[in-house]
Amino acid sequence: MTRQNTDYGYDIQKVYLEMFMTDAESFVRCQGVFDPKTFDRRLQGSAEFIKDYVEQYNALPTFDMVNAATEGNLKDPGQLGENHYDWLLQDFETFSKHKALEAAILKSAD
């Protein structure tokens, strides 16, 4: 099920990053479409740090590490159920498609 006209603003993008940081399996599954440039400007530094850290150390950084390195404000969402991560995977896929389409439209306008 693909949702239309969804607002992929700062708050939901922040939730994506916070949830990815608590579940390595979900991050790995989305790593192929995880592009820090698609995130809100205020979150790009955190997204880039997470991506680079995972590539270099093959593990997720801590919230303190990301926040200290990027002056971010990511918070641990606490214990989440499997259904929460199912939502994350589905919603992040839709977000990624939306951002790819948005980029293609902007590129074609140039």
Predicted regions and their residues:
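Noncatalytic partner-interaction/assembly domains of nucleic-acid and motor enzyme complexes
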Residues: 1-96, 100
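Conserved P-loop NTPase architecture
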Residues: 106-110
